[in-house]
Amino acid sequence: MERAIQGSDAREQAYSERWDGGCGGTITPFKLPDESPSLIEWRLHNSEESEDKDNPLGFKESWSFGKVVFKRYLRYDGTEASLHRALGSWERDTVNNAASRFLGFGQIGCTYCIRFRGSCLTISGGSRTLQRLIEMAIRTKRTMLQLTPCEVEGNVSRGSPEGTEAFKEESE
């Protein structure tokens, strides 16, 4: 059985548990292990002398089902190979398998969140809309990772990515 780890974020500690399951296990939606940088690596990359501030080491993403949150940090350098690898970090089947452990007869909240280049996008819905949520998450992840820093700023100032309004209407 996987071990539950409390998150460092106060809200996460109050409302949910973080499951640090191994990649490809039956309990996690992710196929790849967490690749969080060490504190030393993070400091070196984000030092004051660093010339390229828009070159993050990677991105964070999470899936949550009710109060259980699965998180991963994945390396991403913007190359085609890195994009292909990042897009394969989870699949419809792995999300459905992880969700099935927590979905009962009642409706619970399901959420996908991705943070990249200082921008965070969250998509959520009820467990009955999970399949549509997965489709939106796939499109959102692909779009967000392919945006340039200027395009990320533009999308943030517009409020939400294209298509989320229709999803909200369908899930209500």
UniProtKB/Swiss-Prot annotation:
InterPro entries (alphabetical): Tombusvirus_p19, VP19_sf
Entry keyword Ligase: no
Q: What are the boundaries of the region Disordered?
A: 153-172
Q: Please give the Gene3D superfamilies that the UniProt record associates with this protein.
A: RNA silencing suppressor P19 (3.30.390.180)
Q: Which GO terms describe its molecular function?
A: RNA binding
Spell out the GO cellular component terms annotated for this protein, sorted alphabetically and separated by semicolons. Answer: virion component
Q: Which UniProt keywords apply?
A: Host-virus interaction, Inhibition of host innate immune response by virus, RNA-binding, Suppressor of RNA silencing, Viral immunoevasion
Q: Does the keyword RNA-binding apply?
A: yes
Task: Tell me the domain of life.
Answer: Viruses
- What binding partners and quaternary form does the record give? Homodimer.
Q: Belongs to which family? A: Belongs to the tombusvirus protein p19 family.
What is the protein named?
Answer: RNA silencing suppressor p19
